[in-house]
Every structure is written in C-alpha cells, then in structure tokens.
C-alpha cells in the first residue's frame, strides 16, 4: 500500500447532527477528550482551560451558548485520524449546515432519550439521505428519565425511514442506570457516575449469564433478561453493507455528560464508517487515492481571527496530497495560485499545516476571490458537483441607520453572502437590498456581525416576498420577453444570478404555467 493509500485509509470524516439541546456540544467535547485533543472537558458555559473544548467562537455564540458556525476539529484515535465537523445546533440554522453535510463521509445522529426524534433531526436526515450518508446513532441522556428504548427505535424507523439496529442496550435509566449490555459481544459495560470530565477505563462484566452480572443488576436482572429476549426477537441485526448504503443505523445508548458510551460511538465510526469516498465532478468521478490533488470549498468564514480581518475558505480534500507551498489551479478562474499557509483546525486554535490528504479539511486564506463550491486541482479543469444553494424561506428589506455607510453595507453583505451566512438580492426596479435566510436567527446574526465587523448598523423591514427562484432559460428571445414582463419582481443575487422574487405561492404557480420555457429553480449549484 502506498503511503498515500495508507493515509487515506486512516481517515474518517464525519459530522454530528442533532436537534438543539440533545447534547451535541457535550458529545463533541467528550469525543475530543477521547482523542486526547483536550485534557479536561470543562462544561461549555464556563471553560477556563487553555484549549477551548468547543467550537462556539463567534461573539454572538458566546452570548447564546450555541454553535452558529460550522467548525472543524481534527484528532487522532486508535491509529486513525478523525475529522469532526461541528454543525450549528440551535433552533435556527442556515445553509451552512446543509453544506457541511456535503463535505463528510458519515454522520453521528444524537437523540435526546427523553424526547426522541425532533424536527431539526428530521430536516438534517433529509439532507443526509440525498447522498445516502451512513449514520451512526447515539441515544443520549440515560442519566435522566428516558422514553422506552423500544419505542425510540420504532420512532427512528417510522419517522426517519431507516432501519435501526441496536448494538448496545441500556440497563435501567436515571437513578437506576447501571450501564449498557453489548448485544453481540455478550458483556456489560458498567456505568459509574461522576467521571464526566476525565478519561476512565470502564469496568466490563463478561457474560450476562454470570454471578457477577446478577450481583450488578440485583433485582433488575430477571426483568432485563426478559426485555432482552423481546429486543433480540424484534430488532434488526446490524448489517455493515446496509449501513454503508445509508439504509440502516447502528444504535448506541449512553450519557455524554457522564462520559459514558461516547467511546462506543467513536469506535463504530472508526470500525464501520467509510474512509474518504470518491467524489462526483462534472467531468468524471475522482478517486481519493489519485496522486493529483483536488478539493472543493464548502464554507467561507469571515473573521475567525479578530486580530486579522481575514476570511478563511474551508476546503475538503478529495484526492492527492496537500503540501506546503504547492501550486493549485483555481478552476473557476482558470488561475494558478501558490498555497503556503493552509490551516488545520482545532476549533479556534489555528495551526499551520505541513501536509494533508483526502478526507482532511484545510483552511485557505481568502481575499475575496474564493466562493463556496469552488474546485481546486493540480492543473485539471474539474468542477465538483452537489454543493447546493437553497432558496431562502424568509425575507427582509435592509434599512441603513446611517445613509452614508451604504458602501460598507454592500461590502459587508456581499462578504457575508459569499460565506453563506445569508443570501442577498438586489431588486432591478429600485435600490432596495433584500436579505433571504433559512431561519430567523440568521437575520440577527447578520445584523450583529455587520455591527461588530463592519461597523454598520441596520434595521429590517417586512417585505412582500414569499420565495425566491433562480431563473434559467436557453432561449435568449424568450428570456428577454420574460424579463420585460416580470421586471417588477426580478432581482440579481449576490453571485450575479437572475432571480424571481415571488410575492405569493399562487403568483409563482401562475408564472410557471405562463412561462413553460423558463425554469424556476429552488436550488442552484455553486458555480
């Protein structure tokens, strides 16, 4: 095996998906603890350790205790290199989250054992399903009261349309939580409370049919054995092939806060989740073990470093090897650039990088020329596909508090739009600026970042827009005719694409009927 093939085989790149408050930040922290990336897992609200154990680093996130921006953390575990991509976990999330899921090979779904499948989880699973992403599931908060585990598995199957195969099974919960039983390995992992902040070796009891197991379970023993018979009769057995196709999820139980069960999940990612996968480009499919470098940008983040007004483009490497000082072709611009200072990530601790392989995420300094979806290669003209823009669902008109700052406002919005934090539209018929977002919090984020980073204060007004559609038409004459007729509702987005801002659902349906030659698109690929 070549060095490169060996490096690729070691990599696992995954994201965590969950509904707000299911325990995602805690599990992120505990995963980093497993990978020895941090020495002490502090609780998120009061971290004083040098290496912040989490990715909540922007001003507004610090105040709200939610992870708004996707962050990337790399750590070693059992001879492997794990790349963990954090996704926004709050009520309201942006396209950032969707796009992060295009940069991973598998995902870890965290469910709150007391609540089960929640709306945000459903939305994220829909995105994973577009690419048949393999999913590992962790049912969290066993140190509290949870719903009946069989009921939880039924709900995963019914609502998320994926087969659930339990790997471990909980012994009691809340005050009676005794640990988990490994179904195929026939052993118990004993839960001892109070070790949430440190790495400890869990006690193992071999064989359920043993005196030690009977002592540990006490009067719960008979009931547990009966429950297990039911579980083994009713549940799916784990099939690695079905998991890799995105049809089945292995399910683990534990408590992230108690640092219990998290290592089982990480072992599953290393043992079962795929190494970096081939990627589709317009021209051909790119294999991760190819010698020549290629990668695509899935996110742009402004101002990661308050000391430098910089913007970082996050790139997923798809093939080859990044080495310091190498020359890359920026495919969209057809220009060659030399990259000497790519970054690797440990949350906001940024370190310079010597080399990286397929599956790794690196950060490129961006001076305004890189956009989301851009492909970089070692000379070949490639364009990776599948990095979408989604039509926003909410719209506001932007009003400046200080009219003299319109230049800063436009620059700020243009940069934030490139970064994917919002979408910006410039109507053809006036000088309005319209913002579009997937969730309400995005508007707050944009206003607070304009104020913090660009020193521009703005307010929002309601606007009569129901949805946006990108316009495509190969017939120039028809397009001109359409533009003349639909002028009142046309706008150009931040990337210069013609967009139709529909005031109502009915209006959009009528337009689609009236103009069959025009394509009204709800998503567009980044080009």
Curated annotation (Swiss-Prot):
<comment type="similarity">
    <text>Belongs to the TRAFAC class translation factor GTPase superfamily. Classic translation factor GTPase family. PrfC subfamily.</text>
</comment>
<feature type="domain" description="tr-type G">
    <location>
        <begin position="9"/>
        <end position="277"/>
    </location>
</feature>
<dbReference type="InterPro" id="IPR027417">
    <property type="entry name" value="P-loop_NTPase"/>
</dbReference>
<dbReference type="InterPro" id="IPR032090">
    <property type="entry name" value="RF3_C"/>
</dbReference>
<dbReference type="InterPro" id="IPR053905">
    <property type="entry name" value="EF-G-like_DII"/>
</dbReference>
<dbReference type="GO" id="GO:0016149">
    <property type="term" value="F:translation release factor activity, codon specific"/>
</dbReference>
<dbReference type="InterPro" id="IPR038467">
    <property type="entry name" value="RF3_dom_3_sf"/>
</dbReference>
<dbReference type="Pfam" id="PF16658">
    <property type="entry name" value="RF3_C"/>
</dbReference>
<dbReference type="Pfam" id="PF22042">
    <property type="entry name" value="EF-G_D2"/>
</dbReference>
<dbReference type="InterPro" id="IPR041732">
    <property type="entry name" value="RF3_GTP-bd"/>
</dbReference>
<dbReference type="InterPro" id="IPR005225">
    <property type="entry name" value="Small_GTP-bd"/>
</dbReference>
<keyword id="KW-0547">Nucleotide-binding</keyword>
<keyword id="KW-0342">GTP-binding</keyword>
<feature type="binding site">
    <location>
        <begin position="86"/>
        <end position="90"/>
    </location>
    <ligand>
        <name>GTP</name>
    </ligand>
</feature>
<protein>
    <recommendedName>
        <fullName>Peptide chain release factor 3</fullName>
    </recommendedName>
</protein>
<feature type="binding site">
    <location>
        <begin position="18"/>
        <end position="25"/>
    </location>
    <ligand>
        <name>GTP</name>
    </ligand>
</feature>
<dbReference type="InterPro" id="IPR035647">
    <property type="entry name" value="EFG_III/V"/>
</dbReference>
<dbReference type="GO" id="GO:0016150">
    <property type="term" value="F:translation release factor activity, codon nonspecific"/>
</dbReference>
<dbReference type="GO" id="GO:0006449">
    <property type="term" value="P:regulation of translational termination"/>
</dbReference>
<dbReference type="GO" id="GO:0003924">
    <property type="term" value="F:GTPase activity"/>
</dbReference>
<dbReference type="InterPro" id="IPR004548">
    <property type="entry name" value="PrfC"/>
</dbReference>
<dbReference type="GO" id="GO:0005829">
    <property type="term" value="C:cytosol"/>
</dbReference>
<keyword id="KW-0648">Protein biosynthesis</keyword>
<dbReference type="InterPro" id="IPR031157">
    <property type="entry name" value="G_TR_CS"/>
</dbReference>
<dbReference type="InterPro" id="IPR000795">
    <property type="entry name" value="T_Tr_GTP-bd_dom"/>
</dbReference>
<feature type="binding site">
    <location>
        <begin position="140"/>
        <end position="143"/>
    </location>
    <ligand>
        <name>GTP</name>
    </ligand>
</feature>
<keyword id="KW-0963">Cytoplasm</keyword>
<dbReference type="GO" id="GO:0005525">
    <property type="term" value="F:GTP binding"/>
</dbReference>
<comment type="function">
    <text>Increases the formation of ribosomal termination complexes and stimulates activities of RF-1 and RF-2. It binds guanine nucleotides and has strong preference for UGA stop codons. It may interact directly with the ribosome. The stimulation of RF-1 and RF-2 is significantly reduced by GTP and GDP, but not by GMP.</text>
</comment>
<dbReference type="Pfam" id="PF00009">
    <property type="entry name" value="GTP_EFTU"/>
</dbReference>
<dbReference type="InterPro" id="IPR009000">
    <property type="entry name" value="Transl_B-barrel_sf"/>
</dbReference>
<dbReference type="GO" id="GO:0097216">
    <property type="term" value="F:guanosine tetraphosphate binding"/>
</dbReference>
């Amino acid at each position: 095996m070549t060095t490169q093939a060996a490096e690729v085989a070691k990599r696992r790149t995954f994201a965590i998906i969950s509904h707000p408050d299911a325990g995602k930040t805690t599990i992120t922290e505990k995963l980093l603890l497993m990978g020895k990336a941090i020495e002490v897992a502090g609780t998120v609200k009061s971290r004083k350790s040098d290496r912040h154990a989490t990715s909540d680093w922007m001003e507004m996130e610090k105040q709200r205790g939610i992870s708004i921006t996707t962050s990337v953390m790399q750590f070693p575990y059992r001879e492997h290199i794990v790349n963990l991509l954090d996704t926004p976990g709050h009520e309201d999330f942006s396209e950032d989250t969707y796009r992060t899921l295009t940069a991973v090979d598998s995902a870890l779904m965290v469910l709150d054992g007391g609540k089960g499948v929640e709306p945000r989880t459903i939305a994220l699973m829909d995105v994973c399903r577009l690419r048949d992403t393999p999913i590992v599931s962790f049912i969290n908060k066993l140190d509290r009261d949870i719903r009946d585990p069989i009921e939880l598995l039924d709900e995963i199957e019914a609502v998320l349309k994926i087969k659930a195969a339990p790997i471990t099974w909980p012994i009691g919960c809340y005050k009676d939580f005794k640990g988990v039983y490994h179904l195929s390995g026939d052993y118990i992992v004993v839960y001892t409370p109070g070790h949430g902040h440190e790495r400890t070796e869990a006690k193992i009891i071999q064989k359920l049919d043993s005196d030690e197991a009977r002592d540990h379970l006490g009067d719960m023993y008979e009931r547990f054995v009966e429950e297990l018979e039911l579980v083994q009769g009713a549940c799916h057995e784990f099939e690695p092939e079905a998991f890799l196709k995105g049809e089945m999820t292995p399910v683990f139980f534990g408590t992230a806060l108690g640092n219990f069960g998290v290592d089982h999940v990480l072992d599953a990612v290393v043992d079962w989740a795929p190494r970096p996968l081939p990627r589709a480009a317009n021209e051909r499919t790119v294999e991760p073990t190819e010698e020549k470098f290629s990668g695509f940008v899935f996110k742009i983040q402004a101002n990661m470093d308050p000391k430098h007004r910089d913007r970082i483009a996050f790139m997923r490497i798809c093939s080859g090897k990044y080495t310091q000082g190498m020359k890359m072709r920026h495919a969209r611009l057809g220009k060659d650039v030399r990259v000497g200072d790519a970054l690797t990530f440990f949350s906001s601790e940024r370190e310079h990088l010597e080399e990286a392989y397929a599956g790794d995420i690196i950060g490129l300094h961006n001076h305004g020329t890189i956009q989301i979806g851009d492909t970089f290669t070692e000379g070949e003209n490639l364009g990776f596909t599948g990095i979408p823009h989604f039509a926003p669902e909410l719209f506001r008109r932007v009003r400046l508090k200080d009219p003299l700052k319109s230049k800063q406002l436009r620059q700020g919005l243009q940069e934030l739009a490139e970064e994917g934090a919002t979408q910006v539209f410039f109507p053809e018929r006036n000088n309005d600026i319209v913002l579009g977002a997937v969730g309400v919090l995005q508007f707050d984020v944009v206003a607070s970042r304009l104020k913090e980073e660009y020193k521009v204060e703005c307010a929002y007004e309601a606007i009569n827009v129901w949805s946006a559609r990108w316009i495509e038409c190969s017939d120039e004459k028809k397009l001109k005719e359409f533009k003349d007729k639909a002028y009142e509702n046309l706008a150009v987005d931040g990337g210069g694409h013609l967009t139709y801002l529909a005031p109502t659902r009915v209006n959009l349906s009528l337009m689609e009927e009236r103009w069959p030659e025009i394509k009204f698109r709800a998503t567009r690929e980044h080009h």
